[in-house]
Amino acid sequence: MSLSNKLTLDKVDVKGKRVVMRVDFNVPMKDHKITNNQRIKAAVPTIKHCLDHGAKSVVLMSHLGRPDGVPMPDKFSFSPVAVELKALLGREVSFLKDCVGPEVEKACANPANGSVILLENLRFHVEEEGKGKDASGNKIKADAAKVEAFRASLSKLGDVYVNDAFGTAHRAHSSMVGVHLPQKAAGFLMKKELDYFAKALESPERPFLAILGGAKVQDKIQLISNMLDKVNEMIIGGGMAFTFLKVLNNMQIGNSLFDEEGSKIVKDLMAKAEKNGVKITLPVDFITADKFDEHAQTGEATVASGIPAGWMGLDCGPESVKKFVEVVGRAKQIVWNGPVGVFEWDKFSKGTKALMDKVVEVTGKGCITIIGGGDTATCCAKWNTEDKVSHVSTGGGASLELLEGKVLPGVDALSSV
């Protein structure tokens, strides 16, 4: 899937028009404070472009967290985001207490020229996702007529629709596919994401390496399988490496993560790698812990020694790092999805940090390096490497589905040219 036939914002005349823009402001928060503002910062160029080109207003809508269709302003309100956005844009931002309905429609009907309006969390309405939970926590499905009314209300808030929420592009939610306006364009962030991934997947530089980490094999089967048709080499690390090592080497993994369902397909994946001539590198040693805790007692283990009962592997060890770094050094293009250890805790962050340092080094030598959203993007923020790699994706799930070879509904819904 490429963006070449999709309408992009640079081709739309926004002068005097109200722009309703789906952004991805789903930022991590702690005690109502934003802990990583990357997603807000990333949308600023698209917002500024509209204002600089004479847009009457820019109305911003997004989701935050998982309120499941129940208003939870104490937990998931956009009010801290409004403050952050005001600082980043250097101009006033009006924050509305809802995202649809007569009052919101009135506020957005004829605002002052150059207005920036931020709507409250879309997911306070069950009609955004089409499903959610009631006040007692029981699963409910949205009423079809109410979903249509919700979409109609959103469609009244602008004359032009712009989608810059790559992070939610894999979801067929109302704000992604249900705003019915004559022009539906990709914002600059969406365009950059798709251009990078299209290049990576359609005409990659070689050798092409995928670094795949994270916990569950089952969640990554489609990804591993699709990437085995594209890459020359693959590093499999993180929690899911234990499932591979237990199946392939009969390794004793103690209390480390083991994915029962995923384990059934390990041999098929290895057979596919062999058939396609893809070299797979797995970790050979580990930093272990006596419990899943930041302050756990630590130990070391190898594939041969195994991990004792009651202990678990939470990072790859120094020999694995050597092997991984060597593989990275050979690559001309890298897609990295998922850390290779519990990087959030210093004791178990060394493997991922060493890998990141090497990825930064090869980027400087001309290797194209793409970080696929989610936890790996958080690693870049943590170690300040966001501008030292070629591209950090703002979408975890969306980049994953793109790498899995799927069509993204939010892209599909844009106007074709």
Swiss-Prot record:
Q: What does this protein do?
A: Catalyzes one of the two ATP producing reactions in the glycolytic pathway via the reversible conversion of 1,3-diphosphoglycerate to 3-phosphoglycerate. In addition to its role as a glycolytic enzyme, it seems that PGK-1 acts as a polymerase alpha cofactor protein (primer recognition protein). May play a role in sperm motility.
Instruction: Cite the binding residues for Mg(2+).
Output: 215, 219, 375
Q: Which residues bind ATP?
A: 215, 220, 239, 313, 344, 375-376
| EC numbers for this chain | 2.7.2.3
Names of the cofactor(s): Mg(2+)
Q: Which residues bind (2R)-3-phosphoglycerate?
A: 23-26, 38-39, 62-63, 65-66, 122-123, 170-171
The record's subcellular locations are: Cytoplasm
Organism lineage string: Eukaryota, Metazoa, Chordata, Craniata, Vertebrata
Spell out the subunit comment.
Answer: Monomer.
Residues where AMP binds = 215-216, 220, 239, 313, 344
* One biological process term in Gene Ontology: glycolytic process
Q: Which coarse location class describes where this protein primarily resides?
A: cytoplasm
Report the InterPro entries cross-referenced here.
Phosphoglycerate_kinase, Phosphoglycerate_kinase_CS, Phosphoglycerate_kinase_N, Phosphoglycerate_kinase_sf
Q: What is this protein called?
A: Phosphoglycerate kinase
| PROSITE patterns, alphabetized | PGLYCERATE_KINASE
